[in-house]
């Protein structure tokens, strides 16, 4: 046991993925890519639309063998850096150009493979309400199945 909450992150975008994390012992979840593509996110709409329009294959890993490793939108700049296996220079002006200016080639737009499961920019309240309702439904179904003996440890 840990005396601090364990927060699961990576690959969590909806109720079923939230339920999976909780079933594995997480105390909570972080839905990074899902929250970037929310109506309230201050991130530029170009980035949000790259998530909505992208598939799970539209991301690349930069700094795979360096730190910090990052999964990002597969811009031409990111693909070239991944292919060269060169460390990425984190330029704050370039990042600001991506985050708030919408220049998807300027910096790196961090995005997980779960972007392939995001089909709209929605209000956070709607995302969380639906995710929590779906999570509870999945956990109830698993609890019923375990009680009936149709699944076992």
Predicted regions and their residues:
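Conserved active-site-proximal phosphate/metal-binding subdomains
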Residues: 1-7, 12-153
């Amino acid at each position: 046991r840990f005396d601090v909450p364990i927060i699961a992150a990576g690959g969590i975008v909806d109720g079923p993925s939230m339920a999976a994390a909780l079933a594995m012992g997480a105390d909570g979840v972080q839905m990074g890519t899902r929250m970037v593509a929310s109506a309230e996110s201050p991130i530029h709409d170009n980035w949000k639309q790259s998530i909505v329009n992208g598939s799970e294959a539209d991301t690349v890993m930069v700094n795979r063998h360096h730190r910090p490793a990052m999964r990002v939108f597969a811009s031409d700049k990111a693909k070239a850096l991944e292919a060269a296996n060169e460390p990425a220079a984190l330029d704050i002006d370039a990042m600001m150009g991506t985050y708030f200016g919408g220049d998807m080639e300027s910096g790196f737009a961090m995005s997980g493979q779960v972007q392939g499961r995001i089909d709209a920019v929605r209000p956070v309240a709607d995302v969380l309400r639906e995710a929590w309702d779906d999570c509870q439904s999945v956990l109830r179904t698993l609890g019923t199945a375990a009680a009936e003996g149709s699944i076992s440890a």
